[in-house]
From Swiss-Prot:
Protein name: Regulatory protein RecX
Gene behind the chain: recX
Pfam families: RecX_HTH1, RecX_HTH2, RecX_HTH3
HAMAP family: RecX
NCBIfam families linked to this entry: PRK14135.1 (NF010733)
Organism: Listeria monocytogenes serotype 4b (strain F2365)
Function: Modulates RecA activity.
Localization (cell): Cytoplasm
GO cellular component: cytoplasm
A GO BP entry: regulation of DNA repair
InterPro entries for this protein: RecX_HTH_1st, RecX_HTH_2nd, RecX_HTH_3rd, Regulatory_RecX, WH-like_DNA-bd_sf
Family label: Belongs to the RecX family.
Lineage: Bacteria, Bacillati, Bacillota, Bacilli, Bacillales
Alphabetized UniProt keyword annotations: Cytoplasm
Chief site of localization: cytoplasm
Amino acid sequence: MKITSISVQQKNKERYNIFIDEKYNFSVDEEVLARYQLMKGKVLTEAEIEEIKQADMVRKGLNKAINFLSHRVRSEKEIRDYLRKQEMEAFAIDEILKKLADMDYINDLEFAELYTKTQIKTTLKGPRTIERELVEKGLTREIITQVIEEYSDEAQLENATKQAIKIMKRNNKSAKKMLQQKIITDLIQKGYTSELAKVAATEATSELDVADEAEILQKQIEKTMRKNKRYKPSIAKQKTITSLMQKGFSYDTIQSYLTENEISFEEEE
């Protein structure tokens, strides 16, 4: 089989169409063209053509991978998954990854270190969340253990407290006890240990005093009473107390407030 002509692709000047016996057969990257010294008149066997096509697949995949890496650093697994989505064959993926490693485009330890530092500085995620994300990105347990040590106890507490303050601002209608529990639960879900979550919750709510809680209770009582005034006095009172207890106020605190402020449900009927 003889190459009868070679033409540059119109949309990509770095790729060439190869015609065998006057018919289009395949296309190759400029680097592959030069490597295999493809030119008009050269005779190729079927095995040689298949080898050239495979080499071109690797070259094409390598270019795609480098472009993929140009946006940000990636783990080996992320690149492998990307190449699979590009419908690259297994042999090509393995060779591409080897070439990238030789070119220092892939280094999972450096990737994990950079990713962890970025998450610590730019997000309020806990260490367990970062660990889970690193697992999803294909990092080994050894690497994860090594890089997660960079998340110091001080940095964890600082980030957890910042997150706790955000949670507190979103839930400023609850009693302090309920608010602290909400903060602890949310922080655990965000990847912090229960011990650190408790410390952060205490730290974030440390400035809330009795006066603050009394003001919150007053607003909640007024709001709940308006909502329940369509009921009979006894039912309205029970519903109001139940609702307030669900927000973290104790029964005794509610009763004391109602008594001290001479709040009568009869008057709201």
